[in-house]
Amino acid sequence: MTDNLPLRGKVALVTGAARGIGRAYALRLAKRGADVAVVDFDLHSYKDYQLEAASMRGDTVVDEIREIGMRALGFQADVTDATTLNEAVQQIVGEWGRLDIAICNAGGGVGSPEETRASIVEKDLVDVVVARNLTGTIHTCQAVAVPMKEQRSGKIVTVGSQAGHRIEDNGGYAHYGAAKAAVAKYTQYLARDLGPFGVTVNCVAPGYISTGRLAPILSAMGDAQLLDDVPLGRYGTPEDCAGVIEFLSSDLSDYVTGAIIPVDGGLTYS
C-alpha cells in the first residue's frame, strides 16, 4: 500500500453509480487503487442530462474505471430487488474473492415541493421514495454484510441527505426527508450489529451538490436564496462528497462507526 493508492487490493461496490455523485464515488475509489463494481438500474442514465453526458470519458463508468487501470464490473440492477442485488454481490465475491467496501448511494426523490408536504403527500409517492432510499439501502447492506461478516472486516457507507436533518421552509419533500432520516438511523443500528465483526458502518449526508442533473434545478430555484443558508457560500461538488467517502473507505476511519457526517457547507447547522 502506498500513500497514493491507499485502497490497493481492496474491492468496492457502489450503487447508483452511473452518473452524478455515485460516479464520483466510484472513480475516486478506483483512483485510490480499489477494484470497483457498480450497480445502477441504467448504466447509461447519464445520457438524460447534458452536463452529465458531456463529462463522460467512456460509454459507461465501467469503462472509465478500467481506463484508470483498475478492474471493473457493471450490473444493471434495481436495489429494490433483493434477489438481483444478492446475485450481483455473489458474482463480485466469486470473481474477485472478497468485498471490502460498499457505498450505498442509490436513491432519489419524486414529486414537487408543493405536493410532497407532510399533510398531503400521497401514498404512491411515499412508497416509491421509501423503496428507493430506505428499502434499497437495507437490501444493499444486508447483501454485502454476508461476505464482510465472513471476512470479519469491511467498510459500509450509506448516503443520507441534509433533508433528513433539516426541514425546508415550505415543508416540502417530507417523504424524502423522512426516508433519509430513517437511512441515518438504520446506519447506527447496523453499526452496532456489525461492530463485533470488524465492520464499520457510517453515513454521509450531502447538502446542495451541483451535479449535472441538479445544477440547472438549483439555479432555477435561486442561487442567492439557497446559498444564503450555506455558511461556506457555495454549492458542493461531487468531489467534495467523494473525499469523505475516501476517508470512510480507508484505514484512516478504522475507529469511526455509527457516524452521520454532513457534507453540506454548514447548511444543516445554519
Swiss-Prot record:
NAD(+) binds at R19, D40, D78, V79, N105, Y176, K180, I209, T211. CDD domains: SDR_c. Rapidly inactivated at temperatures above 40 degrees Celsius. Optimum pH is 8.0. Stable between pH 7.5 and 8.5. Its EC number is 1.1.1.245. It catalyses: cyclohexanol + NAD(+) = cyclohexanone + NADH + H(+). Transmembrane segments: none annotated. Keywords: Cytoplasm, NAD, Oxidoreductase. It is found in: Cytoplasm. GO terms for molecular function: oxidoreductase activity, acting on the CH-OH group of donors, NAD or NADP as acceptor. Belongs to the short-chain dehydrogenases/reductases (SDR) family. Homodimer. PANTHER family: 3-OXOACYL-[ACYL-CARRIER-PROTEIN] REDUCTASE (PTHR42760:SF133), SHORT-CHAIN DEHYDROGENASES/REDUCTASES FAMILY MEMBER (PTHR42760). This is Cyclohexanol dehydrogenase. It comes from Rhodococcus sp. (strain TK6). The gene is chnA.
